[in-house]
Amino acid sequence: MKTATSYLDYSGRDDEMTGGVKMIPIHTAAGDFKVWTKRVGNNPSMKVLLLHGGPGMTHEYFEAFDSYFPKSEIEYYYYDQLDSKYSDQPNDSSLWNVERYVDEVEQVRRDLGLDSSNVYLLGLSWGCV
């Protein structure tokens, strides 16, 4: 497997053939679902996971970072929470609680291989609760 050699090189990553998009399985008390993520860039030591507001908002207002993060070679992840834009839409309001959303973010973090040595969380509104 080839290792990425530059900021925009997706070689050797499980999202190499999807332009950075990855659907991540999420396990909840109401069933199993998938949430949408998209990685931009390649930087093993500087990553940001973007947490949007809501419930029900989308990643789209974070797209402004496309004008800033690449210049600093920061790897970043868009993520639509369950019931948002490209993620599954169970339309079950019992899933809209802080504890469940925290668990969802933890499942996303683990699946993406993010840990305290390489990631920062950036949340707005509901995303920073």
Description of each model-found segment:
Residues G123-G127:
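Gly/Ala-rich beta-loop-alpha elbow adjacent to hydrolase catalytic centers
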Residues E99-V119:
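Conserved acidic catalytic loop of the alpha/beta-hydrolase fold
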Residues F69-D88:
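Conserved alpha/beta-hydrolase
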Residues A30-V40:
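A short loop-to-beta-strand scaffold at the N-terminal edge of the catalytic core in hydrolase folds
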Residues S45-G54:
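Short beta-strand element of the alpha/beta-hydrolase
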Residues P55-S67:
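The serine-hydrolase catalytic nucleophile loop
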Residues D88-V102:
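Catalytic nucleophile-loop/oxyanion-hole region of alpha/beta-hydrolase
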Residues M1-M23:
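An N-terminal hydrophobic leader/cap segment in hydrolases
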